[in-house]
Amino acid sequence: MPIGSSTRRSRALTGAACLSAVLTAALTGCGTSAEQAAPPPAQVPAAPPAGRPAAQPERADRQELNAQASAAQREAAAQRRVQTARRWGLAAVPLRAPAAPSSRPELAEGPGVKRTAGLPPVVYRVPTQDKVVFLTVDDGAEKDPEFSRMLAELEVPVSAFLSDYLARSDYEYFRRLERQGVAIQNHTVNHPDLRRLDDTRQQQEICGQQDRLEREIGTRPRLFRPPYGEYTATSLRIAAGCGITAVPLWNEEAFADHLEYRYADQRLHPGDIVLTHFRGPDSWKGTMTDMLRRFLDAATAQGFAVARLEDYL
């Protein structure tokens, strides 16, 4: 083959190869550039419809409005409590009790609790570290509507231990108290000294009042307070037999014109049970609302809230 022909053919092949390489490089370069410039449509975030704000700012605005409304409600409630306390002549707004314990404290033998195997515990002071005390009202002689209203407006939790011979003249008064949150408990039928009664009479006094209160109020008491704070082992056994689980006594007593303390320091203590009575001017130097005002002011001044006894016993 002539050298000249071979050379021309070689140059033609070389030119074709170069052209192919150039075209391949151009195509590859164009493809890469297009991918970098325009991501797939799925990667582009969709714009919100015209005239509609983004979701996150709307949610934040709603949360802010809710927080402002809640704060306003709390402030209004606090102002109502101040006004109510003033209306009833209190020196300060009563303190709010903490949330009720998730379970009742164990009532082991101790300074404020007496235990006898198989019998309901006798409790003078509930074992708790909470700065709370408990108000209990005995008998049922005075049926003061202002006392009922004061309890309701100030939201004071109270336990009423009723004796039938005094309560029976107007059980409707105590039904109204129960409907507004007062717990109704047992204080015997006729308020006798149980130590002087035989088993049969004690049964009639304790379990008879259980039956009466269940019939009149609609609930069967769990708590029993013996008259004068006096009882025997037989009293506790009979009480347990008709549904009693604890026997709360007391450490302090509230009157219309003063408080009586059990201990020399003359102060309330966490878990103290306070006794008072359904009494009025015929028996006291004042009214039941005077008694409640004095007691609440003393508790508040000493840093105590009034809690519901049945949440702890």
Predicted features, each with a name:
Residues M1-T28:
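Sec-dependent bacterial lipoprotein signal peptides
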Residues C18, T28-Y124:
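N-terminal low-complexity, Pro/Thr-rich disordered segments
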Residues P45, A152, P157, A183, ...:
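CE4/NodB-like, metal-dependent polysaccharide N-deacetylase domain
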Residues P94-N186, N190-D193, R212:
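Active-site beta->alpha N-cap acidic-glycine motif
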Residues G118-T128, R168-S169, G286-L313:
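C-terminal domain-boundary segment and adjacent tail
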Residues V133-V137, V158-L162, A183-N186, R222-R225, ...:
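Structural recognition of the beta-strand scaffold that forms the well-ordered cores
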